[in-house]
């Protein structure tokens, strides 16, 4: 399980497992204020095929192909597309893409801080928030990519929760 903006951190986690069909690949995107609000960065839900940085991929864009402005409370996830590898994983259904809104991610960031002493980057908090969406079998081994440093997001946490 890893968060996906452009997808570099998730690519590092997934790469060696992609040919192993026993491994479920879960990509967690930022739904921002909600998929239908116009303030989201959920490329799998809102994107279509396009070109960015010379690569054909899934991209949030207007009808005439102009890139639209994504939104996420997490600066690391507000990217208007996903890397070509993730676009392939989405199209081929090799990865499951889930969109998590700001509120759920922030709640999980606070929960991890209070219960585990881990201050996750807000990007990582999005990945952990899927625990509200699904349960895993106790016999499964589940990897969460805990990337980034939450201390860089302390001001955002403090402002958001009015701490």
PLM feature segments, named:
Residues 22-28, 33, 132-163:
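Catalytic phosphate/nucleotide-handling subdomain of diverse soluble enzymes
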Residues 112-145:
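C-terminal structured "cap/appendage" subdomains that terminate the fold
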Residues 1-2, 7, 25, 77, ...:
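Buried hydrophobic positions in well-ordered alpha/beta secondary-structure cores of metabolic enzymes
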């Amino acid at each position: 399980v890893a968060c996906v903006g452009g997808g570099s951190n998730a690519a590092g986690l997934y790469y060696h497992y992609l040919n192993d069909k026993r491994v479920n690949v879960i990509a967690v995107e930022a739904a921002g204020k909600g998929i239908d609000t116009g303030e989201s960065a959920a490329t799998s839900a809102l994107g279509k095929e396009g070109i960015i940085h010379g690569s054909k991929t899934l991209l949030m864009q207007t009808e005439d192909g102009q890139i639209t402005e994504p939104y996420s409370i997490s600066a690391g996830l507000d990217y208007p597309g996903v890397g070509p590898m993730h676009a392939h994983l989405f199209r081929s259904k090799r990865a499951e893409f889930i969109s998590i809104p700001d509120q759920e991610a922030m709640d999980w960031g606070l929960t991890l801080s209070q219960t585990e002493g881990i201050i996750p980057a807000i990007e990582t908090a999005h990945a952990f928030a899927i625990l509200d969406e699904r349960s895993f079998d106790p016999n499964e081994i589940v990897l969460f990519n805990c990337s980034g440093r939450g201390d860089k997001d302390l001001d955002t946490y403090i402002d958001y929760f009015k701490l």
